[in-house]
């Protein structure tokens, strides 16, 4: 590195202050946090790899910071020259360093948000740092409803205790950070929070600083790259770890805060322990849509594993409860039951397994006697599940275990009633109430597993059956004939098929899945979701297959409408379904419908998908009301804006009126799980946001759009869809350009999910899953699926009548939450974007004849951004959100570095003849440092590319995902 660069180089701290020159508020410590973490990291980097390599990292950081200041493309070339001169080992170290920096920046950001939140609460100020755009506090919401909107406290309480939010954790392959690193990140976050506590002593500070450095080094020394793809069982275990670490204790803690908030508006009751405020479901091990790795055996395994984990978590708490409930006074009901348990118990059977209360509990401790029996049965429940999981059988009789939640709750409720009857309500409302709330929330399996399968797979099974019965081909029948036959069979009792049914592997897989559902306890399962559902027969087919496979407690069947045409046809399909008497009797006045944000966005673009999802919900609710059915909408949202992501509070409050009505299901996917539940305070905040926003939407619904707004949206949606499809599906150059200009083809090397990136191995954009589609554009910071179509729609309506239509669009933005949220999220994406990165990728990776096409797309990007600001009435991006603007400025430099790293690495991978000017190894200050860089190359001995290239590429992908705070 040139001496003059060394001389003029400022510290990282100074660089950060140059990027974000002023504090946003008095309690703004983000730059301080960032600088501390980066300074500690650079010291570690120097110790491990030498001073020269540290200075190279600083030089690269400075070049990218200079680029961010003036956006001069020449700086990107200078950056590329430095990056391509590195040898294989150094290249991995530098890419890994910037990826690590972005993870540290995320942690600093989380600590700052948490700190500001605590400071606001101490002052009694509930205003959120994002102008209330991402927050929804339960106490603030209750006070607003009662004191501003004049709702009665009882009315609010009744609505709250009857509402349900079901959070569905999915294993979508967007969590690019390994669990090993997530745990280290949590410890770094914890150290950073404590370091800035007001009451910290000098000794504490020194020890915390040492711990911080230790964890930063441990994270940097951990291989970021998964060397093998996770299995569905791995994904399920990773998902379950959040329950163990935060959610399990987070739920009762949150419900206590709800009790306090209710008390503050004059309600002296607690939320009933069995009120279904928060529920949890999962797709991990149940989502077989396009994932051949999710087999019936996998589904069985994850159900048994969840049951074993649940029993173990209850078991670990029951002795604490036995210590707490040492009272001798009880009511007659409990006394009779305790005496009966005492007489019949044989403590010697399981006493050897216990550390505490291993002798028979005397009758003068009746609560302990009753809870002792609960402990015995929990132990047997856990062990039976463990045996079934490992051996397929168990010697423990099922009657010795808990088989239903009601059975589990019975002795606990008995203890609660007795304590209240004896004047000990304060004790009853302690740990026992928390335990009751956990049992009511988590049941015997922590989560209920949804099953998801493509509608065509059910059609194939029924086609095989009808052909075997020699009554024709189900596949070739009309919808009317299918319905007639299905209803005839559902009304009859004859079995449709026996062991002689010819079965392909695919047909056996579908039927065996139903057999697993029949075999396992019903409380293991939630919904059966049919993807690519288009007609009533899709739903009736699943009902018939459940009956034929002897499912005694049939799962509720949920059609999933994803593509634009399916969303448009969904209300009519639902009306036809509700017109079927058999089905209407079967559902008992309740229906769930899932709407997909990802595929609708890929099919038509974000603008048209958002509007069609809005209209479809309105129409579906109208249909349900007409037939007297309570409808629950299940929102299949991803983390990125292109897949329906965005702040929770706003996403809920911008839904159409009457579409939530106290009942909401929503997916929590991939990296969003960590963002929602990675820490106790994040978990608490997530539960608050969902609960408060759902309550507010029901009791203070958003306005309905004016007829002229609807007409404007309809007009713009047609234009936006045409623009989007004309480029993505009809432009002959697009597929080639997309695959050359982005790392889409290399996405699978990240090993971040168990399912393939495509539904079918060949084909174009339509066969590509939504996640890699969004991932590829997020990596290049061009975000095409999010904004494409907006510009054309705005331009056409403004060209028609600029003054009138601009006035109407601005009125829509200022008065209609849905429209404002839609535009604000696109504005946020523009704040993260940089078309010059796309131009660099084009120059390096795209054939020259496609360069004009890339220029055309970038012109559309700039025009769309300009029109969006005009409609929003903003002079510059994020002018109304200084906090987000500051956070993005601080992370842009390392992201840009990784963008350039990625472009040049892709060039070297795709063009082996590409020549680079290499310089001597940098990390040579000591033999040990040199050796450690070489060892990084050895982590991937089977790569088909030149040493170090594949790992460098994957590290850039992971780092950019961390920096953008989204993968796909």
UniProtKB/Swiss-Prot annotation:
HAMAP family: PEPcase_type1 (MF_00595). Its main location: cytoplasm. It is found in: Cytoplasm. It comes from Phaseolus vulgaris. It is an enzyme of class 4 (lyase). Keywords: Allosteric enzyme, Carbon dioxide fixation, Cytoplasm, Lyase, Magnesium, Phosphoprotein, Photosynthesis. GO terms for molecular function: phosphoenolpyruvate carboxylase activity. Through the carboxylation of phosphoenolpyruvate (PEP) it forms oxaloacetate, a four-carbon dicarboxylic acid source for the tricarboxylic acid cycle. The keyword NADP does not apply. GO terms for biological process: carbon fixation; leaf development; photosynthesis; tricarboxylic acid cycle. Homotetramer. This is Phosphoenolpyruvate carboxylase. It catalyses: oxaloacetate + phosphate = phosphoenolpyruvate + hydrogencarbonate. InterPro entries: PEP_COase, PEP_COase_bac/pln-type, PEP_COase_Lys_AS, PEPCASE_His_AS, Pyrv/PenolPyrv_kinase-like_dom.
